[in-house]
Amino acid sequence: MPKISLLVAVYNTAAYLPQCLDSLLSQTLKDIEVLCVDDASTDKSLDILHQYAEKDERVKVFALKENRGQAHARNVGLSHATGDYIGFVDSDDWLSRDALEKVCESFRDDVDSVLFRVLYAYPDGRMRDYEMSPFTTMTGDEAFRASLTWQIHGCYVVRNSIHKAHPYDESQRAYSDDNTTRIHYYYSRKVAYCEGVYYYRQQPVSTTHNISVRRFDFLLANESMRRQLLSLGASEETLRCFETVRWLNLVGLYMFYYLHRHELSLTDRQHGLSVMHHVWQTIHLQQVSPSIKRKFGYMPLRCSWSLFRLQEEVYFWLRGVVGRNR
């Protein structure tokens, strides 16, 4: 049984895949398995995976016949994972040579999840640390709360038992894997930080940066997260915390709509408004922080969707006047 199983979901990343796989197979910790799931790539990615599998038995390749999204691909790999601990590496990212060794050193006592040190890697060669307050360990509940607004990141390794009990959320093709990260932190007794580096390649056309109707999936993924919290019997305090974050995210997505609606098709604009209207109608306002709800731009105005939209239009117009819509 390997010490660590790494899930690598692959879709059309042939240009970066060798760097990713080379970084995994050259780890100072040799006792690993690399579970690569090709999500119906149309480039040479699958050929590259087979080449690596032929050279190193630690690489296992699974090919999907149709594109199902990252969460599904990772779940396919997860179903075959046998390591004591399980993590993921995106197929265009890579690890420092000692990253997994440092992760293993941090799994002690009642630590159930270990975060990497994340460095953003830019096309011009610049590197920048993910900004978060330093810590050695925190409780799972503290980590869960910090992850709601990404005060801590989601690049980590977790105990097999937790990951197998809580596979990736496939409710949306984008963003819903964030829910799984939060659930893993929620169920961890302790979450630790290590200095092993995860290099996170910055792509200007990634889902998180792209001007696309898929950005509104973020709100639907949030809704799925709430359903999971309810099914897990989360405390009222946790639900209040998350519902406040959901409300802030709704206003944040309205800002995206305000700034970029002319770059979206009519159909996409209508879809975005429909999703936001649904969240506005169904969010549990009694669980949203009162201090947030009293602020102009954040007042629910549940009596009228049109009035709420007017508030948002005026709010973001005023922000634009003073140069704050960035």
Model-based region annotation:
Residues 12-26:
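Short, well-formed alpha-helical segments that are part of the catalytic scaffolds
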Residues 38-47, 66:
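A conserved acidic beta->alpha catalytic loop
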Residues 140-218:
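Conserved nucleotide-sugar donor-binding catalytic segment
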